[in-house]
Amino acid sequence: MSGAVQNRRMDDIVKQAMIKWPNVPDCYGWLGLDARGRWFIRDQATQASGDFPAQKGSELRHEKLLDFVARNYESDAKGQWYFQNGPQRVYVELECTPWIWRMEPDGSIRSHTGEKVTALRCLVDEAGKVYLVTELGFGLLQSQDVGMAALQIESGLWMPESVATSDLESMFGFERSPQVRQRGAQLQQPHAQGV
């Protein structure tokens, strides 16, 4: 279960660019999503300094750009999440999970992209982090909202299941670091001249 819901909101201009320029190379390492649902741009200097999240980069704060990223965020068949930037896929480095959930005071839940969701399952790891499975997929409840989650659990609305952090990617079919996967794939390819 990758939690991949094909983005019904993808911008028409993005879809048109994908058709017009189908062979634009994918981009790795330039965008990160932290455990609080914040987006980070990672330039070459940041990437050279280390992997995400140790080297986060510059937080995106421009509202229209944040909305554009949110509308064009989805995953591929390998569980790698990306932002479709016109004809180019910009793969996202995840600090934790592909979705970050935020609770409102009334108990409602929203994704880091602003979509209202319903908790279908609740999981808690060995560190006490709370994860939810929703109709959009699997994600972490941001740490600021764990107190509100405790109320949901105490009232019996959520029945938490134990989960090991090390099992999350395989259980829910997502890739935290498409960049690391890409590096590994490049190392395994035979060199054209050496074959």
Predicted region positions:
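Long alpha-helical, hydrophobic tracts
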Residues: G3-E63
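Residue-level detector of beta-strand structural context in well-folded domains
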Residues: G29, G79-W81, L120, V130
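Short, exposed beta-strand/loop patches in secreted or surface proteins that constitute
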Residues: G32, N72-E74, W99-W101, A119-V124
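Acidic surface patches and DE-rich sequence motifs
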Residues: D34, D43, N85, E104, ...
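Detector for glycine-centered tight turns/loop "hinges" at secondary-structure junctions
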Residues: G37, T46, Q88, A127-G128, ...
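Short, well-structured hydrophobic secondary-structure segments
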Residues: R38-R42, S49-P98
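Gly/Ser-rich, low-complexity
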Residues: L94-C96, P105, S111-T113
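Glycine-rich, aromatic-bearing surface loops/beta-hairpins
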Residues: S108-V195
